[in-house]
């Protein structure tokens, strides 16, 4: 039987690991935490009777070199050239407006007792920070707030993000792109 606690643990593990990968993929332990999160996700998927194979594939795959992760991250997500996939909500939803999503996220973080202004030099509506905030809400035992925040922010732009991400050519590990898309469908888009 799948308990809410098991679901929350797996979700928190995945959100936390993806947050680190979207903020600093080359950081020590980021990929290892991702592998452990995939172990938790595989367990949850198996309990739910859902395909656990994409998560399990990560467990046996060789770990990429930190420099390889950093290069691929820069190629996919940084810069302004055609094909770059933005990691901020404002890039997807507020191209011609003041980025209200940044202010809304900052307020949500502050209401939860967190301060992000200027941290890491990334906008408050960055996917990594949003996933990190979901982790905090789940750790605070407030999955309802996590779901509400997700629906108010990431759920509005992640489908377009996934479509854009899917169109990219992956130089390092193409299977990781398929896994990433599966993760978002399994955890994020059905939250």
Task: Indicate residue ranges for each PLM-predicted region.
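Charged, alpha-helix-forming regions
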Residues: 1-191
């Amino acid at each position: 039987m799948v308990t809410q606690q098991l679901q929350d643990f797996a979700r928190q593990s995945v959100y936390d690991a993806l947050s680190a990968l979207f903020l600093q993929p080359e950081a020590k332990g980021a990929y290892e935490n991702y592998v452990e999160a995939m172990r938790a996700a595989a367990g949850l998927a198996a309990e739910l009777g859902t395909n656990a194979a994409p998560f399990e594939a990560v467990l046996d795959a060789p770990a990429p070199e930190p420099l390889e992760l950093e290069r691929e991250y820069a190629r996919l997500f940084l810069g302004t050239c055609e094909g770059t996939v933005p990691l901020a909500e404002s890039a997807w939803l507020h191209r011609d407006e003041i980025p209200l999503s940044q202010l809304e996220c900052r307020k949500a973080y502050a209401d939860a007792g967190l301060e992000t202004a200027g941290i890491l030099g990334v906008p408050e509506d960055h996917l990594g920070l949003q996933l990190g905030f979901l982790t905090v809400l789940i750790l605070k035992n407030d999955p309802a707030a996590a779901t509400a925040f997700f629906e108010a922010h990431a759920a509005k732009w992640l489908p377009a993000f996934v479509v854009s991400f899917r169109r990219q050519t992956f130089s390092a590990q193409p299977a990781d792109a398929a896994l990433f898309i599966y993760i978002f469908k399994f955890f994020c888009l059905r939250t």
